[in-house]
Amino acid sequence: MKLSVLWVSVFAFLASASLAQEVTQHSALKGPIDDNALTWAPSKWGKEDRAGSANHTLNSANIAKALATIKKNKALTIGKHYHSEAPGFGPRKWNMWIPGTPTGGPFGKNALVYHDELVTTQIGQIQTQFDGPGHIGVNTTKGPMFYNGVISWDAYERGAGNQVIGMGPLGVEHVGELGFVCRLVVLDAVAYRKSQGKLSAAAEMLPIPKQPGDIGIVTADDVQAMVKAQGLKEIGSGDCVALHTGQGNTWGATRYKSMNSEQRAAARAIFAEGEPGFGISACRYLASRDIALTMGDTSANDAQPGNEEMGYAVPCHSEMQTRRGIWNFENVDTETLIKAGVQEGAFIWAPLKIIGATGSPGNPMVLY
């Protein structure tokens, strides 16, 4: 691709992003309002806290508990591939170019040449992604409210032309300063539904739920039953919990690079229909256990469009993140863990310290 075409593409991407309406007054956005959220602050971690559940990493007992799960001295990575044909929510898209062939050189007596890459994307909210403090909020009469009572109008960092260039106190770098070292509990919902006789032996994934009661919704009772059935110790303070629904297998890291464009398009179609995942009762239960992180193999980890309480938009997101500062990792490759027989391990990862970003890409490691 010629550089002139490259930069036209970049500018077009940036221009499309600027089309979103920006509201600057200190008031609610048009649409639904929930002022119950105004009672959620201050956080249990203190009124000035910006890291939420990453504070569990400061507890040496949590690190010791995580490391105690390592029995075989083996490691796995559970991030998926970043690529233009991989699924993305809504308009989110990964675009990457190599500017120049090569980008620079040759230089010096050794005739050195090099390549760079240029990426345009929603860097914190694409493919395997971590949701940080600035990602999910609730519309209130005071304006959009995020973790620990921060109103977005008051948070924004602005640059030239008053353009918002960062989330200020809600930036993901605050979580990145601490990161996560936690005992990982892997819940295999596919095996569990099969054991109940609710899913065929040949099925690889839970169905997309459409209404309350569908088996694609994992409830609080289901979580507790899976822990017991898998012979695991109870989920406790500072633990991280991964849910395997099987839907992520459609573009798992072990198969994505061998898929052709038609297969990748089919995976994107499944991804766009909805997803099995946690019901709101499961998230409330996990919050009561004081966990550090939820994760799973789908785009949100919330069951949708069907959930236990209908009419809410990905309710675990606001219940866990906005209300409690318990963060969420999406599109994790749980298939790799299931194939290796990993039900428990040490999860180690930290988001990139992108100042003001809403989230972070990443490739976490699990030691077991």
Per-range role (PLM):
Residues 21-368:
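Active-/binding-site microenvironments in catalytic and ligand-binding cores
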Residues 1-20:
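Fungal secretory targeting signals
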